[in-house]
């Protein structure tokens, strides 16, 4: 039994080292966003804390007093493991929230899908979106 436990410990440590060696896999997208210029979004798993998904969202200008809404859906082969949303204050031109990644025995997410939205303005209330995705691992 002790030999098996040592082998499992070695395998877990090796997997963690290899995941760090791969580096950050960031996904960045941008698209035209009307009166806001361009909306840009990025998402990636933190290298300093693997339990965090970092996101960045920005627009060229926000004279419409709109706000950012960032939606994250963590998934694995079995389906969705969790969902979270964060919103900025009105009038911001950038918003960079981080989201907790929950690794449990029952649910280990393997991917994060992110919707980067700007909405709620007076001229363009329905807003604009761009979408990113990022692999996540232990």
Name the predicted role of every residue range.
Residues 1-49:
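N-terminal prepro-regions of secreted/extracellular proteins
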Residues 24-25, 58, 82, 126-133, ...:
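Intrinsically disordered, low-complexity segments of exported/surface proteins
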Residues 37, 92, 128:
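Extracellular and organelle-lumenal recognition/adhesion modules and their flexible linkers in secreted
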Residues 44-47, 102-106:
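Extracellular and analogous surface-interaction loops
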């Amino acid at each position: 039994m002790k030999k098996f436990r040592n082998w499992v410990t070695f395998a877990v440590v090796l997997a963690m080292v290899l995941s760090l060696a791969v580096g950050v896999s960031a996904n960045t997208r941008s698209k035209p966003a009307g009166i806001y210029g361009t909306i840009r979004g990025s998402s990636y798993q933190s290298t300093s804390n693997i339990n965090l998904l970092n996101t960045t969202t920005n627009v060229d200008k926000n004279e419409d007093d709109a706000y950012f809404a960032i939606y994250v859906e963590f998934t694995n082969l079995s389906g969705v493991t969790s969902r979270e949303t964060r919103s900025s204050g009105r009038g911001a031109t950038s918003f960079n929230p981080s989201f907790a990644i929950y690794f449990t025995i029952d649910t280990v997410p393997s991917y994060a899908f992110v919707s980067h939205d700007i909405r709620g303005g007076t001229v363009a209330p329905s807003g604009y979106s761009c979408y990113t995705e990022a692999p996540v691992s232990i």
